Amino acid sequence: MDSVPAQTHQGFKEAGAASASHLTTTTSLPTKVESRTAVMEALEDIVYGSAAGIVGKYIEYPFDTVKVRLQSQPDHLPLRYTGPLDCFRQSIRADGFLGLYRGISAPLVGAALENSSLFFFERIGRSLLYSSGFAPRDSELSLSALWFTGGFSGAFTSLILTPVELVKCKIQVPDEPGGAGARQRQLKPIPVIKEIFRHEGLRGFWHGQLGTLIREAGGCAAWFGSKETTSKWFRGRNERALLKRGASQEEVVASRERPLPLWQQAIAGASAGMSYNFLFFPADTVKSRMQTSPIGGGGDNGGKGAATMMPKKSFGEEARALWKQAGIKGFYRGCGITVLRSAPSSAFIFMVYDGLKKYFPMA
């Protein structure tokens, strides 16, 4: 997943203050200036967050391909891959290194859509909390409130991500598992989209929605919680260091308005990405298995053929089948490589985003 940068929280706080001042100001000019500031903050969040997410996607995508291939190994056959390194070797031997980037066009679009949606719905979640009187508009939200707004944002974003990830998974795992009759699916997004629509209609694009919902709602809540907790710890540490050097109280207060150093933002982002990926990885595994099943059918038929005639499995049915076949370990295939790649990927996303905000401000 692509992360939501910390500086947006200050932007939302300023936007809330702007809304509150609109109720008391007697002239139109200050309101226009403040409204424009809030709009430009939101625009920066969306544009720069999307750009950072796309860059991050290029970094993490080969690891994501390996993860999906590990997750989607068939129930009734011996495992194709003994682990991430073996999957890397076999994949590069079969398709070359660029084969690990198969299907990246849809996720690149998804990275931009995901970030834009996260910012938009997170803002709505904050507005709901402020409107309900949960917190004054000129104050920062508590960590528990940020968990809520993150989960709220992730839940709505999952509706956008499920079709994108469905197409991505179909392309990343192109061969039908098992035996004779396996065919090579066309490895371009448009043909895959047409095939899904022809066999399953519009509803078919949301196959695996429950898994995406669990992963995104829970994952985004964990993202905000981990990110803000780590950032808060760093701010306290920095303030104590200032006081130890003899800084005045005014200097300490002023330091709270400045963004954290990039390396601290990177660590906070890395911890958030690792929490997001680890905590709800089993739901992502079940989703990947659902989304790599044959188009028009529900996956293998126990090696008896006629796979495409089998009905699609629900989330619960797929989870039970995986538990029966591999136990708890089956739900964590590819987890290690996913958590490890999420640390540098999330850190890089934050560094790109904050660099763009600092050197190319829109307002």
From Swiss-Prot:
Membrane topology summary: Multi-pass membrane protein
One of the record's GO cellular component terms: mitochondrial inner membrane
Compartment(s) where it occurs, according to its Swiss-Prot or TrEMBL record: Mitochondrion inner membrane
Gene Ontology molecular function: L-ornithine transmembrane transporter activity; transmembrane transporter activity
Coiled coil location: none
Classification via InterPro entries: Mitochondrial_Carrier (IPR050567), Mitochondrial_sb/sol_carrier (IPR018108), Mt_carrier_dom_sf (IPR023395)
Record keyword Mitochondrion present: yes
Solcar repeat ranges per the UniProt record: 40-128, 141-233, 260-359
Keywords, comma-separated and alphabetical: Membrane, Mitochondrion, Mitochondrion inner membrane, Repeat, Transmembrane, Transmembrane helix, Transport
Taxonomic superkingdom: Eukaryota
Leader sequence segment: none
Record's compositionally biased regions (Low complexity): 17-26
Transmembrane segments: 40-56, 109-125, 141-161, 208-224, 266-283, 334-353
Biased composition (Polar residues): 1-10
Chain positions covered by the region annotation Disordered: 1-26
Family: Belongs to the mitochondrial carrier (TC 2.A.29) family.
PANTHER family linked: MITOCHONDRIAL BASIC AMINO ACIDS TRANSPORTER-RELATED, MITOCHONDRIAL ORNITHINE TRANSPORTER 1
Role, per record: Required for arginine biosynthesis. May participate in the export of matrix-made ornithine into the cytosol (Potential).
Record's protein name: Amino-acid transporter arg-13
Organism listed in the record: Neurospora crassa (strain ATCC 24698 / 74-OR23-1A / CBS 708.71 / DSM 1257 / FGSC 987)
